[in-house]
Design a protein with these regions (language model features):
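Short hydrophobic "helix-edge" motifs at membrane interfaces and signal-peptide entry regions
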Residues: 4-6, 79-80
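NAD(P)-dependent Rossmann-like dehydrogenase/reductase catalytic/cofactor-binding core
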Residues: 43-127
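Active-site-proximal catalytic alpha-helix in oxidoreductases
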Residues: 5-33, 37-50
Length: 127
């Protein structure tokens, strides 16, 4: 594809958001989406990371956040996360390489990312 940055960011956001919230909540995706608090954190994380990508001029798809959340809601029963698998098996989490990358990008460019930061700060203990 022409815009590799866009594809990378769209995948990064999806993987970072769902994997991180599953670990943070210690729930499978299908439970996360039934929990108002965790679902809201998930939604906000997606928006925050989208804003981080926009801050470095990534031409992310219009309605990316909404479409990503809809995708997660529609497939919550079958969504799998290698991050959660590592968490469940007490293996070190690659949270710094995934969520951390988005968080650092946003913060460096003055993007407000309170939900990403809260989740990152909790999960980095397991890295």
């Amino acid at each position: 594809t022409e815009d590799i940055g866009k594809d990378v960011w769209e995948k990064l956001i999806m993987v970072a958001a769902i994997g991180s919230i599953m670990c943070y909540s210690n729930m499978p995706a299908k439970e996360v989406v039934k929990n108002k608090n965790y679902l809201n954190i998930l939604k906000e994380m997606i928006i925050e990371m989208e804003n981080a990508s926009i801050s470095i001029n990534v031409n992310i798809k219009k309605n990316y956040s909404k479409n990503t959340l809809d995708y997660i809601l529609g497939r919550a029963d079958e969504l799998h996360s290698s991050l959660k698998e590592d968490f469940d098996n007490k293996r070190p989490l690659e949270v710094d390489e995934i969520l951390g990358e988005a968080l650092r990008t946003g913060l460096k460019n003055n993007v407000n990312m309170p939900n990403c930061k809260k989740v990152y700060d909790e999960l980095i203990k397991y890295a």
